[in-house]
């Protein structure tokens, strides 16, 4: 979210440095983007037989909420939860993220 970008300068610098250190040619990055945009596994999601949780950032502008809800609807028995924050909500708000994930895991041990 904008708040995260405005208040977490040190964290963002660390992330940017880590990304810059990756040895990824432009062609590989573009191929990755193409895969993200064109790879469609929706028809296979109904075959998932393990406990699954879809956890979405309430303010995520990269993955709209309707896509997260669609993903949830296509996985039988999946749990769905939202968390405060955007696409990087696990870094923006790690405590509630960890609580949600650990709570889900605790129910399915």
What does each of the following model-derived ranges do?
Residues 1-44:
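Conserved alpha/beta-hydrolase catalytic His-Asp/Glu region
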Residues 34, 53, 79-81:
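Structural signal for short hydrophobic segments within the conserved structured cores
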Residues 46, 73-74:
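Solvent-exposed polar/charged
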Residues 48, 54-56, 60:
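Short beta-strand/loop motif that positions the catalytic acidic residue
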Residues 49-50, 77:
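Active-site acidic short loop of glycosyltransferases
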Residues 61-67:
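Conserved alpha/beta-hydrolase "acid-adjacent" motif
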Residues 69-70, 99:
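Active-site phosphate/pyrophosphate- and oxyanion-stabilizing loops and adjacent acidic/basic residues
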Residues 77-109:
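Catalytic active-site module of serine/aspartate enzymes centered on a nucleophile-bearing elbow/loop
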């Amino acid at each position: 979210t904008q708040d995260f970008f405005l208040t977490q300068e040190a964290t963002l610098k660390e992330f940017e440095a880590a990304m810059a250190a990756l040895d990824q040619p432009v062609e590989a990055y573009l191929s990755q983007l193409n895969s993200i945009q064109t790879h469609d596994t929706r028809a296979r999601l109904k075959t998932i037989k393990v406990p699954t949780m879809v956890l979405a950032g309430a303010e995520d502008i990269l993955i709209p909420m309707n896509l997260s809800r669609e993903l949830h609807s296509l996985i039988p028995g999946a749990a769905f939860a939202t968390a405060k924050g955007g696409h990087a909500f696990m870094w923006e708000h790690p405590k509630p993220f960890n609580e949600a994930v650990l709570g889900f895991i605790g129910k399915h041990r």
